[in-house]
Amino acid sequence: MIIWISSYPKSGNTWVRSFLSAYYYSKDGNFNFELLSNIKQFPSKDFSRRKVLSVDDASKNWLVAQKEIVSKKKIFFLKTHNIYGAYKGNKFTTPEFSIGQIYIVRDPRNVISSLMNHYSIGEKEALDMICSPYRNLKDKNDVEDYSSYSFISSWANNYKSWKNSDIKNKLLVKYEDLETDTEQSFIKIIKFTNNLINNSSDVDKNKIKKSIENTNFETLKKKEKIEGFAEAILDEQGNKKTFFNLGKNNNYKKLLNISTTNKLEKIFNKEMKELNYI
């Protein structure tokens, strides 16, 4: 069965994956980027036996690939930015394959500045991206292969789709809580996942502290600078963009035009109020 680590892009998914990798896949809470291979991105080439030639083809492969995953009779963590929904009648996932989900949500005003750096786009284009109900993602390096195709829709649609999913076990995590109450937030995540994987052992608070220490933003940023980061995307010149970029310095009040924040607060008013962002 699958436990989804889901989010709109640049909302803290990699942080949560890194922490879970350090906690569950190391002996002492130490972390290296190779551990992330234990929590793969879905969809991706890792789950396709052949070249996927179109969006339609990609969507038809979603459940086929997941059926093969769950046939292994193990529980897998998978990362995704896809919405919980369907494309032309092809469902992304179902409760049949999904034992639980952790959805990470982040204030869209701070998501925008991260999108700008990550995708080398301007403020207007980032605003258009986060508001578009038709937005999708595909690995730039795979020009003719749609294995990695993800339909992410808008920030609000992405959030609502997972919030309202019919997966039985759900946990909503706010990025802001990860920043301000890190230890308690990750303890909550571990208690949730331990229950799903039938791990009856007590939460190892020492290992949690070590995992947090080894996956905090500054540590990951230093590791990326020294070692590089395989998941960083390429800019137009073919150079890898810095993945761990701003961290706590990502403050929309200092980085965005007031007109952009006003538009976001108007377009996403209902969801932002629901999440106490406004």
Predicted region positions:
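Short, compositionally biased low-complexity segments
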Residues: 183-187, 232-245
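Acidic/histidine-enriched alpha-helical segments
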Residues: 204-214
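PAPS-dependent sulfotransferase catalytic domain
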Residues: 1-173, 238, 242-278
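Composition- and surface-driven signal marking solvent-exposed, interaction-prone regions
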Residues: 185-186, 203-204, 278
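PAPS/PAP-binding and catalytic site of the sulfotransferase fold
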Residues: 12-26, 172-199, 211, 219-222
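Short acidic/His-enriched helical or mixed secondary-structure segments at domain edges of catalytic enzymes
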Residues: 212-239
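Acidic/polar loop patches that form or flank catalytic/metal-binding clefts of enzymes
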Residues: 31, 198-206
